[in-house]
């Protein structure tokens, strides 16, 4: 059942009843939510707005069938921003699954390959994109890398922290132990195609929260229901990112006061 956790959630639910109705169907049975936070961060870049951890939890807490919400994210040791985010996740009441972020060194040393070889480029460029490049472009890029090599730069560093295995295992264990009826996955990665199919074959409900059009084909082919997260933007984005027209409706007095203060 939907019971607004805050007054703002209540007012927004009155403005966006269809979104709440759709969520009500998704959460009509006991549900557990599994969030791949790295995926969410990538979505933010595409969407142009951000997920507010506190507001997101308030929305989830408005549905009494949600049993747990687990966020999977890496911890970058010694990084203040990473530490603050970990604390925020815990303070908001999420279940946290974390592990240290690994710093991977990727070679960009082209000294041992022909100038028209994409061998080094393959290590940090997507294959589909690389296949679109002609030989001349590959040569130009390799020349740029060669110049970096002459300056002493022979590798780049990339942060790695993948939780696909942990998330998949947790979902399947919950399914095997009959811990819940509905599995709500926040990710669009192809690695989840197999766990989703196993959950569906077990007679359980699986729902994918993702950005429409940004779901891996393998996952899409499972037939899993996809909920477009853009439908809940106003419920979960930073308050400053709520459109002014919506702010005027949920708090007209404050909006009027703010407009009078504006130069």
Predicted regions and their residues:
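Polar low-complexity intrinsically disordered regions
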Residues: 1-7, 258-263
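Domain-level signal for Mg2+-assisted phosphodiester chemistry and nucleotide/NA-binding surfaces
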Residues: 2-139, 152, 156, 201, ...
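Nuclease catalytic cores that cleave nucleic-acid phosphodiester bonds
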Residues: 98-263
